[in-house]
Amino acid sequence: MSRFETQFATLNAKNEGAFVPFVTLCDPTFDRSFEIICTLVDNGADALELGFPFSDPLLDGPVIQAANNRALTAGHSSEDSLKLLEKVRSKYPEIPISLLLCANLIFAKGLDAFYQRCAEVGVDAVLVADIPLLAKGDYVQTAKKHGIQPVFICPPNADEKTIQGVAKNSEGYTYLVSRAGVTSAENQAHAANLDTLVEKLKAHNAPPILQGFGIAQPEQVKEALSLGTAGAISGSATVKIIERNLDNHEQCLAELAEFVQTMKAATK
């Protein structure tokens, strides 16, 4: 079994959902980012979703765009992010790790070379945010060749064909988007049809569903689980803690620890 499959099986046995924080790698620096990620795992994160710094992110709202800019301004490259991933994997051999990134970052390195490096540093899954199902072919094939699980997004306006395609092609987990738009901790409105989408994804045997976008409070984690999802992903709310504590790293780590503990408690 993959790390994601093992983790979901473990959580199911305990009747728990998954809490998965997102942060941008190398934000604000390589060393601080490593300490931040360690804090997330040590305080209860069930898996990690991590982003590479990129100057033109597709789905990212202002909070995560600012995180990208901080890492880029500090001079960090995609190779730095890969080295950081390797360091994280070395310390945490069991934690499932997924990447959320844009296709240009993969193109820059070359499809085969990128997925090969992901495998070398211990990445489990990759979600390419701007690759539609219709263009999935080479990505899915190359990912699987290197033992990387491809993940796809199910948008709130997905039709039957899209739902079926997402369910069929996703491995590890399925990313259910709460609403249209970009990531934000402020916009916590969710589409009204999420329960129907969850039912349909399950009917097509989709891998465990994680709900993302606008997950900032424990109540929203509980709400996601009540819809039948396997857990929730929180990006902007996590990164906002980093943003407001740039001048006080110890305070940043303390707030992140409390946040993860609180969000994880909501999965039980």
UniProtKB/Swiss-Prot annotation:
CDD domains: Tryptophan_synthase_alpha. Its EC number is 4.2.1.20. It catalyses: (1S,2R)-1-C-(indol-3-yl)glycerol 3-phosphate + L-serine = D-glyceraldehyde 3-phosphate + L-tryptophan + H2O. Pathway: Amino-acid biosynthesis; L-tryptophan biosynthesis; L-tryptophan from chorismate: step 5/5. InterPro entries: Aldolase_TIM (IPR013785), RibuloseP-bd_barrel (IPR011060), Trp_synthase_alpha_AS (IPR018204), Trp_synthase_suA (IPR002028). It comes from the Bacteria. The keyword Chaperone does not apply. HAMAP family: Trp_synth_alpha. This is Tryptophan synthase alpha chain. It comes from Haemophilus influenzae (strain ATCC 51907 / DSM 11121 / KW20 / Rd). The lineage of its organism: Bacteria, Pseudomonadati, Pseudomonadota, Gammaproteobacteria, Pasteurellales.
